[in-house]
């Protein structure tokens, strides 16, 4: 995540904007995963992960079905997240893809959004907020 100079930066603590949202985070970069997880927790989300592999992500999904998934499409050792996208789509879990690549080809309807790294906090939240807002019990 990159910070911007916008006056609309998120609060640093105590926010409940995403309270109760169960979010699966799949990211093989420790630094990126930690930054995203910290932001989501500050905003009140319950975050599983970051999972660095598809196998880890599948275990987290089985342990606790997420409301939303945030996934880096290319993981360690060239592992592609497409099989994970299929599983999440079968369970009607909205997916946000984050990637360092300028071009990503995914079948239509698999993801809510594709964000290119580095992603600003504002860009990230502009996509995530409406997804969380339409979850049941919101």
Enumerate the predicted regions with their spans.
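Conserved phosphotransfer microenvironments
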Residues: 71-89
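Non-catalytic signal-transmission and effector/linker regions of two-component phosphorelay proteins
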Residues: 1-22, 55, 120-138
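Hydrophobic/aromatic residues positioned on beta-strands within the core alpha/beta folds
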Residues: 98-99
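Conserved phosphotransfer cores of two-component systems
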Residues: 62-64, 87-93, 104
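Conserved acidic carboxylate
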Residues: 27
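Acidic, metal-coordinating helix/loop segments flanking the phosphotransfer/catalytic sites
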Residues: 50-68
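A Lys-centered signature of the CheY-like receiver
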Residues: 117
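Two-component/phosphorelay signaling modules centered on CheY-like receiver
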Residues: 30-49
């Amino acid at each position: 995540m990159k910070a911007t100079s916008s006056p609309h930066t998120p609060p640093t603590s105590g926010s409940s904007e995403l309270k109760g949202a169960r979010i699966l985070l799949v990211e093989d970069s420790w630094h990126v995963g930690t930054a995203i997880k910290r932001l989501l927790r500050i905003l009140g989300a319950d975050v599983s992960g970051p999972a660095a592999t598809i196998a880890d992500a599948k275990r987290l999904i089985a342990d606790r079905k997420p409301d939303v998934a945030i996934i880096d499409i290319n993981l360690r050792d060239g592992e592609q997240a497409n099989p994970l996208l299929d599983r999440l789509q079968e369970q009607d879990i909205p997916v946000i893809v984050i990637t360092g690549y300028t071009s990503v080809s995914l079948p239509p309807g698999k993801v809510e959004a594709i964000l290119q790294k580095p992603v600003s906090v504002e860009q990230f939240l502009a996509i995530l907020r409406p997804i969380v807002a339409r979850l049941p019990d919101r």
